C-alpha cells in the first residue's frame, strides 16, 4: 500500500479546502456511484483511493465536471431517443 501524502495532493489541486471537496466528491462516486477506481484499490478505503487518484493527477475538479456533464448528456440523449421511439 503506497503512502498518500496530503501535501502532494494539495499541490495538484491548489489548496486544501478544494482538495477536501474534490476528494469527497470522487470518494462518493467510487462508493455509491458505481465508478471504478483509476488506481489499484489495494484494500484501501475510498477516501484514500480518491487521494491517490488526485496525487497521480488522474482526477481534478475539472475532470469530474466534464465526466458528469458527459454522463448527463448521454442520459438526456437516451431519454429523448426513448421518447422518440415511443411515438413511432
From Swiss-Prot:
Reactions performed catalytically: RNA(n) + a ribonucleoside 5'-triphosphate = RNA(n+1) + diphosphate
Enzyme Commission numbers on file: 2.7.7.6
InterPro entries: DNA-dir_RNA_pol_omega, Pol_omega/Rpo6/RPB6, RPB6/omega-like_sf
Swiss-Prot/TrEMBL keywords: DNA-directed RNA polymerase, Nucleotidyltransferase, Transcription, Transferase
GO BP terms, alphabetized: DNA-templated transcription
Gene Ontology cellular component list: DNA-directed RNA polymerase complex
GO molecular function: DNA binding; DNA-directed RNA polymerase activity
Top EC group: transferase
SUPFAM superfamilies linked to this entry: RPB6/omega subunit-like
Domain of life: Bacteria
Family designation: Belongs to the RNA polymerase subunit omega family.
Function: Promotes RNA polymerase assembly. Latches the N- and C-terminal regions of the beta' subunit thereby facilitating its interaction with the beta and alpha subunits.
Subunit annotation: The RNAP catalytic core consists of 2 alpha, 1 beta, 1 beta' and 1 omega subunit. When a sigma factor is associated with the core the holoenzyme is formed, which can initiate transcription.
Protein name as annotated: DNA-directed RNA polymerase subunit omega
Name of encoding gene: rpoZ
Amino acid at each position: 500500500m503506497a503512502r498518500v501524502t496530503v501535501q502532494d495532493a494539495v499541490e495538484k489541486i491548489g489548496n486544501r479546502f478544494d482538495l477536501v471537496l474534490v476528494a469527497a466528491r470522487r470518494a462518493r462516486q467510487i462508493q455509491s456511484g458505481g465508478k471504478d477506481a483509476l488506481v489499484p484499490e489495494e484494500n484501501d478505503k475510498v477516501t484514500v483511493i480518491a487521494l491517490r487518484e488526485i496525487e497521480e493527477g488522474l482526477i481534478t475538479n475539472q475532470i469530474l465536471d466534464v465526466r458528469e456533464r458527459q454522463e448527463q448528456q448521454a442520459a438526456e440523449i437516451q431519454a429523448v431517443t426513448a421518447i422518440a421511439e415511443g411515438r413511432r
